[in-house]
Amino acid sequence: MFTKLTPVIFLVCVCSWPVHAQGRDGQHDFDFEIGTWKTHLKRLVKPLTGSTTWVEYEGTTRVTKVMDGRANLVELKVSGTAGTLEGLSLRLYNPESRQWSLSFANIKSGMLTPAAIGEFKSGRGEFYNQDTLNGRSILVRFVISDITPTSCRFEQSFSDDGGKTWELNWIAVDTRVKE
């Protein structure tokens, strides 16, 4: 009688064991971006309002590897007709989950934004988090794509319907500066 139950019990035990990431080590996923870049940025002025007004900026992005490659700092400074934007981003690699967390400095609050968590697959990075915009809860998607040795593209989109639809609100195209 017990011999017929043993495989079922074993299966239950196997399924309850903790699962660890089996994917590739992504610690070097951002190595392509280390250095200085010319940045062309387009920003939707009023996201999730139905507005279609975009503003454009030009400037530089500098990416510095820190903590032996387990982290990097991104410094953005761009200017346009709408003024100047300065940004700072901290990216940290988690070797256990094999994912990156991306946090952005909020100049108004002096705090880091909630981290966007994700990874690169097939040459494309996707990172997600939850945030608030004008008092409403939203989802944020950050995508890094079109990666070559001399250029890359960054997009940010918001969703206020649980991820059913996304509105693109930030497009940055970087071109490497020869140093």
Predicted features, each with a name:
Residues 6-16:
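Bacterial N-terminal signal peptides
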Residues 1-5:
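Positively charged n-region of N-terminal signal peptides that target proteins for export
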Residues 20-179:
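Hydrophobic small-molecule pocket/channel-lining residues, especially in calycin-type beta-barrels
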